[in-house]
Amino acid sequence: SNPLNLVRFRNLVNLLCRRRLDNEHDIFIKFISWNSLYADFIHAAFPDVPTLFLYRDPVEVIASVFRETSAVLLARDSRQAEFLAGTTAIELAAMDDVAYLSSCYAHYFSVILDAQPQPKLLSFAAFAPDALEKILAAAFALQPDRHQLRQMHEQFSVYSKDDRNQTGFKDDSQSKHELLSDDHLRLAEQYCRGN
């Protein structure tokens, strides 16, 4: 975190968030999970912007990674893995993929819980259409009009990673828990319990 990097980051975000239509006033930026390790840097760049950390049961995230490999798993054999997991190369060498991913998620949670100021926290399980208005008000002091709220509600029925909005959303929490063995479930619990 130095002045030049903060300026670069602000410029990049401002470029990505430039207004395209006259009626655009608010923007949401979604960072991937490992960007939580930069919470203090992001806050230093945008100290007046409210933040929300949406967290999910690590078991469900790990199961998703095994279904669709993510960058965090691809980084497993790089030096970046030490940063992501908050551990040493020697400790990483002794971990299987579930232990590595659990260590990463525990590290993300730890950084967010220590961040100053701490972002608002929201469980993925509580992120539901009927709660959206309260969530936006509490986390961002934002009150969307009926049209905006209706558009947001429509998105809840669609799988978030389908850019064509053709795949319906369905709760897969139980099936994700069933993908991991009992040993792996215990391992995830062991790493992430305190967070």
Where are these regions (language model features)?
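Active-site donor-binding segments of glycosyltransferases and PAPS-dependent sulfotransferases
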Residues: 15
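PAPS-dependent sulfotransferase catalytic domain
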Residues: 33-126, 133-146
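Conserved two-lobed SF2 helicase motor
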Residues: 26-32
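PAPS-dependent sulfotransferase catalytic core
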Residues: 1-12, 67-101, 147-195
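A general structural motif
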Residues: 24-26, 48-49
